[in-house]
């Protein structure tokens, strides 16, 4: 059985493009830090891993929210639906109202497409068009309007909210 560290490291080490071995090490260690801090961690069929960290919407303290990151699938299993099935299973287990993710539109735009005005919990140069939400409780974000949000623990580090080119 692959560990979260192994899955994160191998996936990002093989990703190329924006990522290199330094990112692989950073994200694998980040996942370990999140797990040690109590974030929800899920390994799906030994080939995919993700962490979900509690997030507070400052104008909606009653909502149970999480932010997803990091998510990785071993290279030989990518583009075969493992990430989607992992997210579906995590959503069942978390019983959340809303899940947020900061990421590329081509990865997350279809699944995380709930309109919202919740700001990321950490100041980032990333465009707000890359800050996605998925309501799991229909209407959970209705009437919230613009709001700040917050996280604690390892994901509160500004480095992890930066563009990959800024992280290493």
Show which residues each predicted segment covers.
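Conserved acetyl-CoA-binding loop-helix of GNAT-fold acetyltransferases
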Residues: 68, 73, 79-92, 101
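Active-site rim helix/loop that mediates acceptor-substrate recognition in acyltransferases
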Residues: 8, 12-43, 49-56
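Short acidic (Asp/Glu) patches
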Residues: 52-53, 86, 90, 114-118
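A conserved beta-turn-beta hairpin within the catalytic core of GNAT-like acetyltransferases
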Residues: 56-68, 78
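Short, high-confidence coil segments that cap the C-terminus of an alpha-helix
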Residues: 39, 95-96
């Amino acid at each position: 059985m692959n560990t979260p560290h192994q899955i994160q490291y191998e996936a990002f080490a093989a990703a190329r493009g924006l990522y290199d071995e330094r990112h692989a090490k950073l994200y694998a260690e980040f996942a370990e830090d999140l797990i040690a801090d109590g974030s929800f961690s899920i390994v799906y069929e030994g080939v995919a891993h993700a962490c979900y960290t509690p997030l507070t919407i400052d104008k909606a303290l009653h909502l149970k929210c999480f932010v997803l990151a990091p998510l990785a699938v071993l290279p030989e299993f990518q583009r075969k639906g493992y990430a989607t099935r992992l997210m579906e299973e995590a959503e069942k287990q978390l019983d959340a109202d809303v899940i947020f993710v900061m990421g590329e539109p081509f990865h997350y735009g279809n699944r995380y497409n709930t309109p919202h005005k919740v700001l990321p919990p950490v100041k980032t140069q990333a465009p707000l068009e890359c800050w996605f939400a998925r309501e799991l409780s229909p209407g959970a974000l209705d009437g919230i309007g613009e709001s700040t949000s917050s996280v604690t623990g390892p994901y509160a580090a500004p480095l992890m909210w930066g563009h990959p080119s800024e992280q290493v």
